[in-house]
A protein has these predicted regions:
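Nucleotide/pyrophosphate-binding catalytic subdomain
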Residues: 1-182
Length: 182
């Protein structure tokens, strides 16, 4: 059993829709601050679907999904990564205003990922390209943040063993991190 799991640790997965309303974001950040003040360690994993779709459309890229996963070519990945990084920075600033010592962390800092195999749709293989799943999580990296009183705020951009960045579904990133914390 790892050290993180012996302490009270709570993982929030928050979707992009929930982050778009300033009042809701403030309430969320205040609740996180209260939890931390009571001795709970908090990890936050967030998505950004609506903002990503808007950013893609502004770049003239039509968002495409297969079985709920975003088909991610290199241009799409650049937009996804930039948008998630921006959302992350905004959330971290909001948490800091609520008294939380938060740090924005791309998923590839705490997790190794692998590229997803092509999905079968109507009998045809569809390559999702730069899309992956979490294969392992670096608990020591998370513990190091906790040891310094830092709340990790993870956005779901992973990297494979070659260092290639991958778009990871936020639910999958949260699940991978939560499983590793057991």
């Amino acid at each position: 059993m790892n050290r993180v799991s012996k302490m009270s640790t709570f993982l929030f997965k928050i979707g992009g829709n929930a982050l778009s309303d300033a009042k809701d974001r403030r309430r969320f950040c205040d609740a996180v601050s209260t939890m931390i003040d009571s001795g709970t360690r908090v990890i936050i994993v967030h998505g950004g679907g609506p903002e990503i779709n808007k950013a893609l459309e502004m770049k003239g890229i039509q968002p495409k999904k297969v079985n709920g996963l975003r088909v991610t070519d290199k241009d799409t990945l650049d937009v996804v990564e930039g948008t998630l990084s921006s959302i992350n920075g905004s959330l971290v600033r909001s948490l800091k205003r609520s008294g939380v010592k938060a740090l924005g962390v791309p998923g590839y800092v705490v997790a190794l990922c692998k590229r997803k195999e092509p999905s079968i749709v109507d009998g045809t293989a569809v390559d999702l390209m730069y899309v992956g799943d979490v294969s392992s999580v670096d608990i020591d990296a998370i513990e190091g943040l906790f040891d310094n009183g830092i709340t990790p705020v993870i956005y779901p951009i992973g990297a494979d063993e070659n260092g290639d960045h991958l778009n990871i579904n936020a639910d999958s990133m949260a699940s991978g991190v939560a499983s590793a914390l057991r």
